[in-house]
From Swiss-Prot:
GO terms for molecular function: RNA polymerase II general transcription initiation factor activity; TBP-class protein binding; zinc ion binding. A zinc finger (TFIIB-type) spans 10-41. CDD domains: CYCLIN_TFIIB_rpt1, CYCLIN_TFIIB_rpt2. General factor that plays a major role in the activation of eukaryotic genes transcribed by RNA polymerase II. GO terms for cellular component: nucleus; transcription preinitiation complex. InterPro entries: Cyclin-like_dom, Cyclin-like_sf, TFIIB, TFIIB_CS, TFIIB_cyclin, Znf_TFIIB. Belongs to the TFIIB family. It comes from Drosophila virilis (Fruit fly). This is Transcription initiation factor IIB. Its main location: nucleus. GO terms for biological process: transcription initiation at RNA polymerase II promoter; transcription preinitiation complex assembly. Sequence repeats lie at residues 101-177, 195-271. Associates with TFIID-IIA (DA complex) to form TFIID-IIA-IIB (DAB-complex) which is then recognized by polymerase II. Zn(2+) binds at residues 14, 17, 33, 36.
Length: 293
């Protein structure tokens, strides 16, 4: 079976024609030898991947353009064929989907690697039968973010996925159960910095919102409310007290929660507003003039 090779500088090349330039097939994500048409690597990590069977890609032959691609009669030496296992093709497709989603929300390679490993475990265990690979890939990326300490909301994953928020949530629960794994509980602090940055709010509003959310949880004012909705309500309260006001809709669009969800948490927090703000906060709008729900 044909295989790939590497030059001394660790550059991927064709084993039979190491000096021939490689052509990148952007659509398929493959690197193809321009002389014989051998696919020697791909976009998600080169010819070797420990998550694939045997630790490497099987031989993949594409249509070459050089003289080495044809025999003496002008017929292609290597007809278009792929000998890769179907299970590996499924994994490669999922890995590329995970990588694509991660790129769109600027997630680091460590999270991509963890998500790939989680997907491989689900795939090999034949878990989540009846669920699409895209749904499983989205759930694995969500779990990887949580496990790596940089959680994202279901809406953020949904925005770069082909899968609904509801289906990602279902696959998330099923994956945790199937792999007998867990994730740390999310807190309001996990999202506050990113939400405020996306809302273009200054540091003083972010610090106030962080303090408000933390105090609300400590005082047990918002029992049963999700950390995301509490964070959103705290941002709303802090912004309304400042000159950098943001509407419930603006905050909801960033946080991925409905206006009514923000109102419900805010309504619980409002009677205690005087105890929630940090002592050094400079009010533009006094507490007694904050919106009442």
């Amino acid at each position: 079976m044909a295989s790939t090779s590497r030059l001394e500088n660790n550059k991927v090349c064709c084993y039979a024609h190491p000096e021939s330039p490689l052509i990148e097939d952007y659509r398929a994500g493959d690197m193809i030898c321009s002389e014989c048409g051998l696919v020697v690597g791909d976009a998600f990590g080169g010819p070797e991947n420990p998550l694939l069977s045997g630790g490497h890609l099987s031989t993949i032959i594409g249509p070459g353009t050089g003289s080495a691609s044809f025999d003496a009669f002008g017929a292609p030496k290597y007809p278009n064929r792929r000998t890769m296992r179907s299970s590996d093709r499924s994994l490669i497709s999922a890995f590329k989907e995970i990588s694509s989603m991660a790129d769109r929300i600027n997630l680091p390679k460590t999270i991509v690697d963890r998500a790939n490993t989680l997907f491989k475990q689900v795939h090999d265990g034949k878990n989540l039968k009846g669920r699409s690979n895209d749904a499983k890939a989205s759930a694995c990326l969500y779990i990887a973010c949580r496990q790596e300490g940089v959680p994202r909301t279901f809406k953020e994953i949904c925005a770069v996925s082909k899968i609904s928020k509801k289906e990602i949530g279902r696959c998330f629960k099923l994956t945790l159960k199937a792999l007998e794994t867990s994730v740390d509980l999310i807190t309001t602090a996990d999202f506050m910095c990113r939400f405020c940055a996306n809302l273009d709010l200054p540091n003083m509003v972010q610090r106030a919102a962080t303090h408000i959310a933390k105090k609300a949880v400590e005082m047990d004012i918002v029992p049963g409310r999700s950390p995301i909705s509490v964070a959103a309500a705290a941002i709303y309260m802090a912004s309304q007290a400042s000159e950098h006001k943001r509407s419930q809709k603006e905050i909801g669009d960033i946080a991925g929660v409905a206006d009514v969800t923000i109102r419900q948490s805010y309504k619980l927090m409002y009677p205690h507003a005087a105890k929630l703000f940090p002592e050094d906060f400079k009010f533009t709008t006094p507490i007694d003039q904050l919106p009442q729900m």
